[in-house]
């Protein structure tokens, strides 16, 4: 698919033509790690040696005062990050993308967010906490733009509304404070790993930034054609050296099929300035099937009309 001209800071991504594989990219090591080529498969690497039981982080119980303190800290951090993001060129580019293409692409009624990392983790570095907060803020900003609901995910407005698009979060490393903040303050749902997959439908936005190959495989095995998938595009995976046992290639069959489908457009995700938060991230957005179905009869009618108006073979001149 040919790339379209840029509008602002975003553009449609051209599918990469087949050619020699290269491993010289500055992000090659990170891509190999993400593909599971140099470490065990996992759904999150946000903390050191966490104890996960039944898809949920096991952590020491907090006192009520500690819990409230954690919530206040999350609110301060998330509020600062969200305010900075919604004032940034990255947000403006995302807004332009959605406003331009929403009418011609699939509508979304629910949004599933996978593996953003914990908003509040005592042993987590600031970079990781910032990444978790900016991804969460960006995910909810995208939901806002898709619903034109300017209050979704904003805890500072006295007129705050619950999102019309149902938002479901899954992150095994969420703390109790993270869960409380997402559900009580932001009006979202949090489920245990891997229950979020049960909520994926063809009208879903699935958010999986920097996930392992098996996660994309699980998503697209359940629902082959979600309305939108935000994650690592096929060409990034395809540029990796082939794995010996074919495990990665098998997991990514669904993504390769989506990438090749004429039903999907692929857009580069607007970058988080000065950070690698959304490097190698794209938006697969399915075209609106209802509009496509309506366009077919119209195109056929126009084709018939054009044929009716075509000049036939020249008539022989009357001979006197």
Predicted regions and their residues:
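Domain-level detector for long C-terminal conserved domains
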Residues: 2-9, 17-38, 43-44, 49-110, ...
